[in-house]
Amino acid sequence: LQQHWQQLYETSETLLKINDYERIVLVKNYVCPAIAIISKSLEHDEQMFRMVYDALPLKEGETEPMMNIVAWRANDTFISVVFPRYKHRPDCYFAEKEQQFLVSPGSLDMAGLMILPREIDFERITPTLAEHIMREVSLSDEAMHEVIKHICQHNVSSWKQEPTVSVGIVSAEKIHFRLNGSYLIDGELITGEQTVEYSKGEILWQSAYLRELVFTPKDQESSFSLDDVTIGLNFHWERKEVQTFLGTLHLIVDNGKIYAINELPVEEYLTSVISSEMSATSSLELLKAHAVISRSWLLAQIEKRKSLGKGTEHQEVSTVRTDNELVRWFDREDHTLFDVCADDHCQRYQGITKATSPHVKMAIDATRGQVLFSEGSICDARFSKCCGGISEEFQYCWENIRKPYLLSVEDKAPLGSVPTMDLTDEEAAREWILSSPEAFCNTHDGVVLGQVLNNYDQETQDFYRWTVEFTQAGLSALIAQKTGIDFGEIKNLVPLSRGKSGRIYRMRIEGTKLSYVIGKELEIRRALSESHLYSSAFVVDSYDIVNGVPQHFRLTGAGWGHGVGLCQIGAAMMGEKGYDYQQILYHYYKNAEVRRLYE
């Protein structure tokens, strides 16, 4: 264990982080479950050991949990590895004749130095048997899952006061900014126009080469303005503008660029986010619900970043490809240099560039510190524009994990109702999509839609049910362009698998040259639109058949977006109907509760 520690540590998963140097990690690539405590001080070492100790199961009749511990010192760092145990001795200890091995693993055995009192056992034991013995006396995977969950809860419960969030604003080889007010750097007051440039692997500022720069505001009113901040990245409204921010400006170097990071209190950040994403006309209860959702997602991201450690940001993409099928899902980008980015890929954050709505400030203050909780963890609170009448479940859009708080519900009273129709069935899905059943999000009320949609999106109000027409030439060219596959002429689009909301997550494209299966829902939406099809909850009708090939196609669909979690249009209507924010949240997030983490 000690010999290979550096390699094991690099592949470990952080469960709890005290600071950049002290943490609790799960050792992942070892023969048996192990938890390591990395510390530099006696105080933190005791604190983290107590967290691990309290997380371990206690057997009936025992006074303390079973474990082995191996500890050593590396320079000024103390490393303690805890091996949670299920039992004292393996079954082979009590076996008879040649089946017996007198092995009773202790701390050194669990750390990789197995001691056998009998020479006959020493000569006969194999690496496979040794591994089996260590696994047998250790906690099971299920028991370890509970231990890990218990340790991770300390990340949340330790937030007795408002946390700080770090937001990546812009990255470039050269950044120009203006300090509007006095900022401290190394005890010196700085103000006015500034330029930093990437040079020789460092930041060049005022003729000095530095690895990082931290500009700390002298007072709460001081702000800084960054030039050339991109908004709407990869969307049709993409552009650059000057944006102004409160809080600390942190400049760091990574991968040949300088990153400008804004560090500020969470509640201040949320006030800007909700003001940017929601209309000033939104009802107070809708704004409260969105404040809780945004805060939940943000704090979950902060915790996720702790487990990722430092490095270059990446997007989570999973692909399953065979000769005749491509199933791919995209999740939000994971940043490791900062907690979240400032663009729509995370949450739209524009500092104090745009006016803050007093209505939003009221909603933020009313829900201060509140998040959605489920099974001891902060909820990954997803949302979309319009569910189409029934919300979708997580596993049909992203990773094949069923999240207990992201279950399918009918978007109507009684709240949180399980769908009465099985929309995974093709006939039922067709009947549902071609009808217009009652739902909170089934509305053309301009006042309600104006709470959720910007002016551009309100040019059409056909979100609950919509149609798209294609010619044969248009559809075959579009699919070839978007997939990179020449199908020839398109003969059919065949739904193979649907989720609980009727959204297709596996679809076969049949052409005159070949057939191919694609998924999940976003991959399907991308293949059938220049940007994104409203949703993958659609049925296909083809007509004007010539030699077995349709000349026209009509897609009739339901909803806008992935449909998982809160339905924004539905939630806006609920607010208009008098439901409060907790009723709205509990309707869309089953098995969750609203909990206040800090005052």
Label for each model-derived stretch:
Residues I151-E599:
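Conserved, single-site charged/polar hotspot
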Residues L1-N155:
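HIT superfamily nucleotide-processing domains
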